[in-house]
């Protein structure tokens, strides 16, 4: 790629990011509110986890379908969100991105509620923001 092409590509990517920023913030803030605590947790969080995963998958499915994406839920344990970009049928045209929505227990010391999806101080705060709900939000935006 020529330097000019790279700069044009960067400019287009920045334009798309800014165009979709509010949608990303809304989606991620909502996704962070689901207490999708991993099976290694105990007590109340473990008891509530199956219902929270169902709700999170339902939310993700609604959003995927709104965006014209295909959503397949695999027994509440995994989901595939697919965009059919090419009709060639060639598997080499496909790209897969693996992400997860389970998080470890929040622990203490949070400045904002760990399952609040709070937008403050120029950040989105919540358990899973970096690992791995944030990347899911960027894909879905």
Predicted regions and their residues:
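Acidic/His- and Gly-rich active-site-bordering loop/insert found
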Residues: 3-129
């Amino acid at each position: 790629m020529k330097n000019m092409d790279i700069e044009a590509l960067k400019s287009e990517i920045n334009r798309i990011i800014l165009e979709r920023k509010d949608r990303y913030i809304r989606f991620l803030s909502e996704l962070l509110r689901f207490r999708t605590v991993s099976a290694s947790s105990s007590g109340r969080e473990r008891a509530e986890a199956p219902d929270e995963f169902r709700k999170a998958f339902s939310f993700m499915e609604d959003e995927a379908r709104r965006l014209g994406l295909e959503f397949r839920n695999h027994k509440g344990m995994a989901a595939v969100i697919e965009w059919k970009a090419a009709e060639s049928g060639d598997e080499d045209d496909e790209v897969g991105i693996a992400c997860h929505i389970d998080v470890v227990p929040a622990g203490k010391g949070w400045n904002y509620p760990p399952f609040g999806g709070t937008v403050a101080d120029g950040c989105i705060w919540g358990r899973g923001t970096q690992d791995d709900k944030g990347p899911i939000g960027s894909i879905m935006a």
